[in-house]
Amino acid sequence: MKKITLIGSELAKTGNEFIYLGHLNECESCRFKRICHNNLDVGARYKIVSVRSANHPCTVHENGVKVVEVAPAEFTILIESKKALEGVTLTHANVLCDKVCCKNYLSCHPEGISGKYKVSSIFSEKIDCQKGHSLKKVSIISLDESNK
């Protein structure tokens, strides 16, 4: 589902992705606070799908902000093979692993998943896990509150 929000003008480019981290103290008295923050879920990853041309003043972003339309971003992660079913909705849980130097660690512990997600496709490549876990690479879309 697409949502309207504001983002720094320098960052407002179609195709850019971001993880929403919440509002700052500087946002409390801003007249745009509602549109900036009320449509987004903290910790969720979004992709900018369109940018409007008007620029608005902002105390956080030096060059102001633009109105953008965003949608949950699709990205790849690693999950347990037994859970890797196309179309299934899962509640995210990181793969149990403490091997922070492993090349797969960030895919097993991804940022930008807020709760539930839907598996949109499964890759066939073999994943070598240092801990011996049976893993699959999948493409997912985070489900925000309005999609649940």
Curated annotation (Swiss-Prot):
InterPro entries: UPF0179. It holds the Pfam family UPF0179. PANTHER family: UPF0179 PROTEIN MJ1627. Belongs to the UPF0179 family. This is UPF0179 protein Mevan_0979. It comes from Methanococcus vannielii (strain ATCC 35089 / DSM 1224 / JCM 13029 / OCM 148 / SB).
